[in-house]
Design a protein with these regions (language model features):
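Short amphipathic alpha-helical segments, especially helix-boundary/capping motifs
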Residues: 8-12, 46-50, 74-79, 156-161, ...
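Short secondary-structure boundary/hinge segments and terminal tails
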Residues: 12-14, 55-56, 95, 152, ...
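Active-site acidic/histidine proton-transfer and metal-coordination neighborhood
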Residues: 17-114, 215-222, 241
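Active-site beta-loop-alpha junctions enriched in small/polar residues
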Residues: 6-11, 51-53, 89-91, 117-121, ...
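The substrate-binding groove and active-site-proximal loops of carbohydrate-active enzymes
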Residues: 14-25, 168-174
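Aromatic-lined substrate-binding rim segments of carbohydrate-active enzymes
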Residues: 1-2
């Protein structure tokens, strides 16, 4: 069996990329996980989140520490044939456009790649198509995720409290992300990496969940059918029939 991709965050694994007291353990934990788990299963892409966002936002020094930590992990994992691909995420230390660009500009492209998540980038105030265009050679894989149209071009990231009240995520076609433009970019540039559907499960307050009367089983089936059909019909992705 070969693993296509794995995320970090295993039990006991440090994911603190900003605290100088914690980053040595973060490096050691990640290198050990790559050596003991990813490499034996032939996994060659490792998507990593970078922990929680500092309470006052991410400072320039903390961004530099994130980049240095990624560089050191990536320097060691590439020797194992594993490409380290950080995943900017709202509520993480790398969230806003200047932070994403700084992370990529301060990391060595021989050691550190990029996992753009279209929904997370949009929620962070970025134009997902533009940032993917600018850093296309660094992209290891792509996560297709959507949000509501009201967050497109937003200047502020929605809070965790807002997300707790009502999910900031949406099925594909919610209007937050220009998916036809995303797919055109990838096709025009002959992107050869993995493109993954990233969907959060239905919950009370979501459009699809409430429309189906709050039946979780039906909502899950409806979510899957909606997103698979969007990929197939709207984006022209060749997929097997949905049974």
């Amino acid at each position: 069996m070969t693993l296509i991709d794995v995320s970090n965050g295993a039990k006991g694994q440090s994911t603190n990329f900003t605290d100088p007291e914690e980053t040595p353990k973060t490096i050691a934990d990640h290198v050990a996980f790559a050596r003991d788990f990813l490499q034996p299963f032939g996994c060659d892409v490792w998507k990593v989140n970078m922990g929680a966002r500092p309470a006052e936002g991410t400072s320039a020094d903390q961004l530099k520490r994130v980049a240095d930590t990624l560089n050191e992990i990536g320097r060691q994992t590439i020797e194992m044939g594993i490409r380290l691909a950080p995943h900017p995420h709202v509520w993480g230390p790398v969230e806003r456009e200047h932070e994403v660009r700084a992370m990529l500009d301060m990391t060595d492209p021989d050691y550190v790649w990029f996992t753009p998540d279209t929904g997370q980038l949009t929620l962070g105030g970025l134009d997902a198509v533009q940032i993917m265009t600018d850093y296309l050679p660094r992209i290891a894989e792509v996560h297709l995720k959507d949000t509501y149209a009201k967050y497109r071009g937003n200047t502020e990231t929605p809070t965790r409290e807002q997300h707790a009240e009502a999910s900031v995520y949406h099925n594909l076609g919610g209007g937050g992300v220009d998916f036809p433009a995303v797919m055109k970019l990838l096709r025009d540039q002959h992107f050869k990496g993995w493109v993954m559907l990233d969907v959060d499960g239905p919950r009370e307050g979501d459009d699809g969940f409430d429309a189906i009367g709050g039946n979780l089983d039906l909502a899950v089936d409806d979510y899957l059918a909606h997103n698979v059909n969007y990929l197939r019909v709207v984006l022209g992705v060749k997929l097997p029939p949905l049974d």
